[in-house]
Structures are given as structure tokens and as C-alpha cells.
Amino acid sequence: KGDTGWLIIDPLTGEETSRLAMELVKKHLGDHPVKAVILSHSHIDHFGGIFGVASREDIESGKIDVYAPEGFFDHSISENVMAGNAMSRRATYMYGNLLQKGTKGSYGSGLGTTSADATPGIIEPTYLISDREGETKTIDGIKVEFIYTPESEAPAEMMFYFPEFKAMCQSENISHTLHNLY
């Protein structure tokens, strides 16, 4: 939480699931407005839930800022819309979406329990991060050090560090699953 509201990182895959997550946050952590959203990279499971945490109107008016790596929108469209049908068919096999749930069918996708069945959304970011040497922004009172890492785990990707909290989000650049190899 920032000085006046929430800073959301990667709002899940779809609007319905991210909206339910925000309801839990408000119930247990306080009903504060969303001030900014950080989209770490161009894979739909990290940005598709944008409209569950922020409205298009609030983003377009500048009420809520959206930070993403340079190339985010174009790479998201090319991978998730233009290649979406092929990727969806691949996911059916890869995640076992058509298998019966349970120990004799599917009990997980490897990355999680299953892929989301929710409405994805996308919007052009209001701020693009493009400096490979790093750039620092203060978002609602929170200092964030961004590092642009294109063509890593995704075509458009970035990592970021919160020095006040000694916390780093490496997106999916540092991962033990090597999930893009299968």
C-alpha cells in the first residue's frame, strides 16, 4: 500500500478473478483506492485481470497509472490475440484442461491448480519502462527501481525492486520450473 491507496502488481488472468481478489483485499486489509498497476510482462496471466482492479475510464483519465515494459502492448497482442487460438489449443494439451479433475485426471497444471476461466482485458500502459540500466519512479510514495529485461522469459518484461522494503519482484526471470521449455 502506498500513501493513499493500493499499488497492484500483475492483476491475474481475468477480470472476475481479480475483482474477487480485490474484494478480499478490501475486506481484510482496508478499502483504499487503486493508485497504480504494474504489469511485469506480456503474458496474459499477468495482465488479463486489469479491469477487475481498475476501470478503463480511470486509467485513460490518469486517475490510475499503469506501468509496463516497453513493447508490452504490441507483444501482448501478437502473442495472446493473434496467436491466441493456437496457444489455447496448446494449453488444452499442456494443462490437461479437458481431463476430469481428480487423481485419475488432472490435479494441477504445473504452474497452478488450473488455468483461469475468466474474461481477459488489456489496455495500453500510461508509463513504459525501457532503460536496461534501471530507472526509478516514486509511485504513491513508494520508491520503485525498475530494470527493463526484454527477450528474457517474455518478449517484453521487467523486474523491479522496492528499496524501502528490501523486496524484489523478478517477474518470471528467475524460476525453478523452466516452464517455457515445455
Residue positions per predicted region:
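Residues that flank catalytic or metal-binding motifs in active/ligand-binding sites
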Residues: 62, 123-125, 133, 156, ...
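Generic beta-sheet signal
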Residues: 67-69, 170
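Active-site environment of divalent metal-dependent phosphoester hydrolases
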Residues: 42-48, 73-75, 153-155, 175-178
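Core dinuclear metal-dependent hydrolase active-site scaffold
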Residues: 1, 128-167, 174
